């Protein structure tokens, strides 16, 4: 960093950003689950969301794989698993406004490779009133059963895993002050 000769060495603060609330929601399935579900190419697919992992201030509610947020400014980070579906992308879709809020990055999970990827989505947005959202996912190649991620497939008596559940889609939500 090079400063001009006239600089006095101080840094000006442009704004304060703080978070008043935080929540985590996810698609949580039993450890016996072998796969996250079929991911079919050709259109956006809604990802499962069924559990509030943490929401101490009640900023989010979940129903039918959709979540509701009240008016405010939010930062959202989501990870969406994919397996052998080639190119993948996730998106945050605003059901209330019938529009996409943000598209995520593109990740590649080769159809012949034994590789699972985590597609990521990061965004900051403001809503003026309560709005319903869902996480959507699209892929290049249909993968039956495993396309939406690989589970543990741990049956009773399995000693390989200490977990009794597996997380697929994970959404972290920060509400700004």
What does each model-identified segment do?
Residues 1-22:
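Fibrous stalk/shaft segments of extracellular and virion attachment machinery
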Residues 17-177:
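Extracellular jelly-roll beta-sandwich "head" domains, especially the C-terminal globular C1q domain
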